Amino acid sequence: MSTSASQSTWPAAGPVAEALLDVSTWLIAGASVIFVGVMVLLVLAVQGGPRAVRARLWVLGGGVLFPSVVLSVLFVYSERHQPPWRVAPPKDALIVGVTARMWWWEVRYRDPATGQEIVTANEVHIPTGRPVYFGLSSDDVIHSFWVPALGGKMDAVPGRVQHLQLQADRPGVWRGQCAEYCGAQHARMALHVVAHAPAEFDTWLAAQARPAAPARNGALDRGREAFLAHRCNACHTVRGVSEESRLGPDLTHVGSRLYLGAGTVPNDDARRVAWLSHIQQLKPGARMPSSAERLDPATLQAVADWLGSLQ
């Protein structure tokens, strides 16, 4: 599986992105030709010295006819190649709900076997080779969902559901970003799209539908008990352990995610401890207090280890 940490439109990873890239390429090529032409005329005008010209002919040709033809051609081309961003999904479509919040993403699926809602955060997993339909909304301010390698961006607006269609043609991991300024940590409101082969996606979705695995040993169980004792579950759901709140990201399978804090830091043992201890240094303004002043190092390590075990 290929991995890219960049937010580039090139190379395109799906048909929607390819259509946008084609239009952009033609626009850039056309603009380059016009720029070169203008520079050539400017040089000729400077070197040629004063001479009589038919001003009206230049105005009509260069100021009216030429831009009208260029804009008309580009308009027709772009309209014919406009990707189907807002196509109504068929009955058997994979629909992914994405709710933007300051400053993270809640992601929701439906288990095709049971109809159960499956909730995760900050990572969108999709199968390759088929369109995926996104329902985008926001719980606070206007955000914008954008994964450049897969397609165009779409605003997530409070009180509305916006629809976007994307598709990945090959397995891989692509970074996305909130593309609408939404507050202090806008720059750290990223997401990752993980595209699997269809069979692998079905396996992933089935695993996500299961509740959190029981603690495998006493040390992990101490982490689970500390998580509950210090009321982390007042904001975070861990299915099978506590389902009181969805104020913060669902942590049922947080150990399987690539990053913490909506792409802020990689999800490994050391950074999980650092995230719990000093979140306000890593993501100032996040709606979660740093825990270093409330919990001793051993307790922080136990909670971090337990969260890491939630695969």
Question: Across the structure, where does each feature detected by a protein language model lie?
Answer:
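Non-transmembrane, membrane-proximal soluble domains of secreted or membrane proteins
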Residues: S2-S24, G48-R246, G261-P284, S290-D305
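Hydrophobic single transmembrane helices highlighted by the model
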Residues: L20-G37
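Alpha-helical transmembrane segments
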Residues: F35-G48
